[in-house]
Structures are given as C-alpha cells and as structure tokens.
Amino acid sequence: DTLWDEVKRFDYPHKYYVDFSQKLWQILPLGPTGYGDSPYQAFSTFAGNPYLIDLEELIENGWLTEEECENTDWGGSKSYVDYEKMYQGRFPLLRKAYRNSHIAENAEFIAFCEENDWWLSDYALFMAIKDSQGGASFLEWDAPLKLREPEAIRRCRHELSDEICFWQFLQYLFAKQWQALKAYANGKGISI
C-alpha cells in the first residue's frame, strides 16, 4: 500500500477516521532511509523517502506503464515490506520515469528546485555522490569529498549533474504528492 491507499481509507469502506471521530493521523518520519531502513535514521531532515512516491501518478503522466510496475518483484507479502526488493525494483522505475519526464525544462520543477535550494542542492549532491561511491558511507569516501573540498565538490556537481537532477526530481515528486495528500486529509478534518 502507498500513503495514498491509506488516505483513501478516510472515505472507504466505512470512513473509519470520520465515522469514529478520529481527527489525527499519526505517521512515522518520512525521510529517506539507508541501511536498516529505520525512519528514525534518515539521510535528510527535509527530504522525503522515494519509497513513498506513488507510481500511479507516474503511470498517469506517461512516464511509466502499468505493465512495468506490475512486472516488478516487490516481494511476496502484503504485510511485510521487503526493503531490498523495494530498492531493487523501485529505483529502476523511478530512473525510467525521470528519463521519460524531461523534467529539467519544466517551470514548476525549476521553481521547486530554486525555492528549496537551501537544502535540496546539498541533499541531491550527497545522494548522487553516495550512488557514485557504490552506496558507501561518506566516512569511506576519498578525503576531498568527505571534507567537501571546493574543487572536489565543483567536479562532482559537473560530472554528476544528471544524477543530481534525478534526486531533485524525486524530491519534487514527493513534495507534490505529499502536499496533495496532506490537503486531502486536512479537507476531511484529519490532521497529520
């Protein structure tokens, strides 16, 4: 289930939250998780977890197909999340959606990146470098990167510019979906 599936339960089948006067939906932190997938150990205070991006919107936008999503191995359990399969299945789909979106020229995306530059630029750079380092902890990176030496950072911003844009794209999607979900829940009288 996605967050949208959960919020739809406000309406169906028995409007649990509304019928039982529930006014608060308590959730775990939504940040992007690393090894161990604990929501309390996120890579960023401000970023959202790409695992929570609803792929339906990407299908509706024509960036993915239903078949691609259905043919992905998400694991066999409806009650247990297989995070390894989630990672292995979700990121190739998200990368494909990114390539198909041609988002770099989208005015709304550009505005989002500019408005959130105070955290998004460093977060996207960090994640791009982390991927380029095989997912290794930053403690294992070469000293110039680990110590954020200006020349090393400039070089990475140039060499990893497309990967940086990918991570910005994920945050753009997450933020859009989260804002819509929150507005929907708030409209039903539910605070998050």
For each predicted feature, which ranges?
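Acidic/aromatic-lined carbohydrate-recognition and catalytic surfaces
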Residues: 1-192
